[in-house]
Every structure is written in C-alpha cells, then in structure tokens.
C-alpha cells in the first residue's frame, strides 16, 4: 500500500529553504492563509515545505498549521545553527537526536538559574516536557543517508579538516548565545552540540500530535573560533551558505523515504 501522506518540512528562512527547492525541481509556492507553502515531489513522495520565519512561537504556529491541514507522515526541520563546542567548524552537519528548549528556566530568589527539565505545573496546567527525542527510524535513515557523503567545504576560514556529520542534541531558544562561558554552561547542562531558534518548538508540537520528527542542522558560526561577522559582507556570505549542507542531507533522507514509499 502506497502511503500518500506528505512529508512536511518546517524551515525558518528562505535563504535555507532555497537550497532544497532548486530551479528545475518543479516546486510551486503559494500562500495557505499566512503561511508560504512550497510543494514538490521526490519520486512518488509528496513534500510540503512551510517557511515559518525565525523563532520558537513562529515555528510552533507553522507546525500546528502544517499538521492540522496536511496530516503528514512526519515533520522534518533543517537549517543553520551556532556551535556549542570548540571542535566544530562552519559546514559541519548535525543530525539532531534530541531537541531541548534550553531557555526554560526558573530564576530563584538567590539569582540561581535552574533548568525546568520536565514540567511547570499549576494545578492541572503544565507546560509539558522541554526535552524532545527525535524519531529513532528517522535518525537511522539520516545516518544511512550520511554514509559516503562529504559535505561541501565552507568557502572561507582555515578549518583543519573537511566538514563532517555528527549526531547529538540541538538547543533551541529565542536567544543567540555568543558569550563563551554561557556556551560552555549550556553544553555542560544539556550536552548540546549547537543552538537554533526553532527545533525544540517544532518537536514539541509534533510530539503533541504523535507525528515523527527529525531536525538536521549545519554549523554556520562558532563563536569560540570567530565572533560572528554582522557586517554586510559577513551577512552576504551567510545568506549564500546557511542551511545548504543540511538541505542536501535532508534531500538524501527524502530520497530514501521515497524508495520506501
């Protein structure tokens, strides 16, 4: 029996999404309510990519829209991320085994910050879990897709090796962390390899609907190595490169899902 349900992609930025919907892919984009949806197929596999905009609220809202309207077989997220560890370089790719909403904290009366690892509960009203495991089958399929694949080198810098694929925890919040001690704290607390502003929110909504989820990120900056260049020149480079390698691995994953259809 052929599964006709689509795969939904929730992607923050057009600069990321465009690497997957290349000219000649047959992709068609139209608004569905407020959401730009791009539809294309990989073999028999229907794909709907929704550009959510940046941030936890926007990506959660886009995911709820996607699931309620399209009843997907799974939800995928890809894009760029900032490293939480020193030995990653721009161009490295992370298969997210977990996503954590790392800004879900309590600041107690002493000023100490305590991560709320599970619930904020008042009566019967809870926020829910803040750590979300990716679907095991999708992780395994992404690992298979990454075998014998070499991500393209980052065009600038002096990385001592070619980009590589890793697996680990993605941290998410409406925060861009540049302070080295804070990066170290987040990595120690959560074992995060990198941070973005969407994955955990998408994972939470997908989990509420029991829809399998996976996130794939590529490293666009490592503040331990070089402070992010916010100049026009630096922004121009990022616009060209962000999400490119994560998109390529996502396409390889989609091709394998199409074969299994």
Description of each model-found segment:
Residues 50, 76, 94, 166-171, ...:
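Hydrophobic/aromatic beta-strand patches that form the interior of the parallel beta-sheet core
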Residues 85-190:
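Mid-sequence, gly/pro-rich, charge-dense loop/helix-turn segments that line enzyme active sites
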Residues 18-21, 85-87, 104-105, 225-226:
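Short glycine-/acidic-enriched loop or helix-start segments at secondary-structure transitions
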Residues 171-228:
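A C-terminal functional module that forms or caps the active site or interfaces directly
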Residues 1-71:
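N-terminal short beta-loop-beta anion/metal-coordinating cradle
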Residues 223-261:
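His/Asp/Glu-rich mid-to-C-terminal helical/loop segments that flank catalytic regions of hydrolases
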Residues 33, 54, 98-101, 218-221:
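Short, acidic/turn-prone active-site loops that include or flank metal/cofactor-
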